[in-house]
């Protein structure tokens, strides 16, 4: 790996007059890990929230997620092949994050719905758009994004992959 990086670095330096144009064409650089553990996808994450009812209403009405009740009265938000488990602050399930805090998340959600339609729907739901649409870099390529907040002030980014 060190040799590969050294060769790449030497190549870029040798293209000194060209290096800015070479680098400007790169949207991101990925390095392969030698770790034997390969993660395939995210199954679920946990949001700590102040009010389960406000949160489930927001995510179901504004973002179309399905509210799921499991293991008695636990709540989750289901979409695609993922879910967001909800923990009410002060009533978290073990094990839990070291400092579970409402409003500390920053989530990027991908949709195929055009962002204009998303923006119109957000406005109709009384949700304030903080920014966007703006161009960003997603996990698998360029995206266009809208930013807004959920009832706990988590930052929510809804994005389309650019063609």
Swiss-Prot record:
- Similarity annotation: Belongs to the glyoxalase I family.
| Gene3D superfamilies, sorted | 2,3-Dihydroxybiphenyl 1,2-Dioxygenase, domain 1 (3.10.180.10)
Query: What's the short name of a Pfam family annotated to this entry?
Result: Glyoxalase
InterPro entries documented for this protein: Glyas_Bleomycin-R_OHBP_Dase, Glyas_Fos-R_dOase_dom, GlyoxalaseI/FosfomycinResist, VOC
Give me the gene this protein comes from.
glod5
Which species does this protein come from? Danio rerio (Zebrafish)
Descriptive protein name: Glyoxalase domain-containing protein 5
- Residues in domain VOC? 41-161
């Amino acid at each position: 790996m060190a040799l590969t990086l050294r060769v790449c670095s030497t190549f870029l330096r040798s293209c000194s007059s060209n290096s800015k144009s070479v680098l400007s064409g790169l949207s991101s650089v990925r390095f392969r890990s030698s770790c034997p553990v390969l993660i395939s996808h995210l199954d679920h994450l946990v949001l700590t929230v102040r009010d389960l009812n406000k949160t489930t209403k927001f995510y179901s009405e504004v973002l179309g997620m399905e509210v799921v009740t499991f293991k008695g009265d636990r709540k989750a938000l289901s979409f695609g092949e993922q879910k967001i488990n909800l923990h009410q602050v002060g009533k978290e399930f073990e094990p839990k994050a070291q400092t579970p805090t409402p409003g500390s998340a920053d989530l990027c959600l991908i949709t195929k719905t055009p962002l204009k339609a998303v923006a119109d729907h957000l406005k109709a739901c009384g949700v304030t758009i903080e920014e966007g649409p703006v161009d960003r870099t997603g996990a698998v390529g360029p995206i266009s994004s809208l930013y807004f907040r959920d009832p706990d002030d988590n930052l929510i980014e809804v994005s389309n992959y650019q063609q």
